[in-house]
Amino acid sequence: MQTELTFEQLENFSRKWRENPDKLVFQASIMKNGIKAATENPTSKVSIQPVFSHEVATDKVSNQQQSGRCWMFAALNTFRHKLNGTLGLKDFELSQNYTNFWDKLEKANYFLENIIETASEDEDSRLVSWLLDTPQQDGGQWDMLVSIIEKYGVVPKSAMPETFQSGKSADLNHLLNERLRTDAVILRKAFTEKKDTAGLKEEMLAEIYQLLVMTLGEPPKVFDFEYRNKDNEFKQELQITPKDFYERYVDMDLKNYIPLINAPTKDKPFNQAFTVDYLGNIVNGTPIKYLNVEMDVLKKAATDQIKDGETVWFGCDVGQLSEKTTGIMDTDIFLLNQTFGFKTAMTKAERLDYKHSMLTHAMVLTGVNVANGEVNRWKVENSWGEKIGNNGYFVASDAWMDEFTFQVVVHKKYLSKELIEAFNQEPIALKPWDPMGSLAL
């Protein structure tokens, strides 16, 4: 039987508050400045310095603006760092709008196919409700970007630059999702009436293509690649295709890269491969697949890759214990327990199980600091522009990484034979709403 909150209890709560006058100082500061500013720990800011024993040379940060394309920016940033070093470019970027266009069109097709597949289920079934919650969005996972690149390649930012809607995606997402839900109504009715759903879907996608062209521009089939390197030498290649550009200039075999996750919940054993039902963007594309490993294994692989001069795509819960102004992510950055007098002591597994934490954002690890043989902090390249953090870069303490990092993508050469074999086994399929199916925004 549930019990209501009584006035007697409220009086008791108020009395306990008045018995602690020292908290009036905290109250005044918090009410004027907010929780984070009032509880910021200066010791943490001093100890987390942006200096690293091992660091990959990078250029200025990119800016995803008001969009949820961090996973795309992070992956393309790992590619451009390699390309910039090889070709001697400065502040060169690959087109995030190009991959965004194909991602949205493919997600539309993926959604409509899933609507047709589930057309016999009730509208209020958990699966259909989950599909309709977000027909498509900006967010994604590493394997989704792999699917796009393998099918469409990449282009320089100059070949397909940003538009208003690529950087401020809310209106486009609203309109596209409204259209997709309308199409879902039509397709489900057509299925019930035994009409041609495939033909209807093709007509729908043709109109969605037009919507995307009008808001993002039409992707180039060929383009001219012309640039000056850091030595001011002019280089030129005419009429190259996006796939040829990737193979010739980026030249990374993405099949050699393995997504590692750290999900220490009871239902996910370590050294086991996982996938997520109904998660993806391209029908018959690269499936979402991870290998769940202990955090020490994940961090060692990332450290080794950085030491060898290659950056690392990683996914985390960026909003947890993170200070944007200085770009510090540390478990001690805010004195919350000391200020409020109670502890929030959930484990990483409990935060996943009880919906308090999950992968929300993707960035790039570009440096690591080793002191006395132990890693104590990491350099992080964000994609929020140069006005956030330290010219766009953040520093994460190793303790923060333990608690709030959920995924890295590393070359398989940094993993043992046993781990590679574990990844290659048949994955366990997770439900679509599992926290490890969350998308980086």
From Swiss-Prot:
Belongs to the peptidase C1 family. PROSITE patterns: THIOL_PROTEASE_CYS, THIOL_PROTEASE_HIS. The gene is pepC. It catalyses: Inactivates bleomycin B2 (a cytotoxic glycometallopeptide) by hydrolysis of a carboxyamide bond of beta-aminoalanine, but also shows general aminopeptidase activity. The specificity varies somewhat with source, but amino acid arylamides of Met, Leu and Ala are preferred. Keywords: Aminopeptidase, Hydrolase, Protease, Thiol protease. It comes from the Bacteria. Gene3D superfamilies: Cysteine proteinases (3.90.70.10). This is Aminopeptidase C. GO terms for molecular function: aminopeptidase activity; cysteine-type aminopeptidase activity; cysteine-type endopeptidase activity; cysteine-type peptidase activity. One of its GO terms (biological process) is response to toxic substance. Its EC number is 3.4.22.40. CDD domains: Peptidase_C1B (cd00585). The active site is at C70, H361, N382. One of its GO terms (cellular component) is cytoplasm. It comes from Listeria monocytogenes serovar 1/2a (strain ATCC BAA-679 / EGD-e).
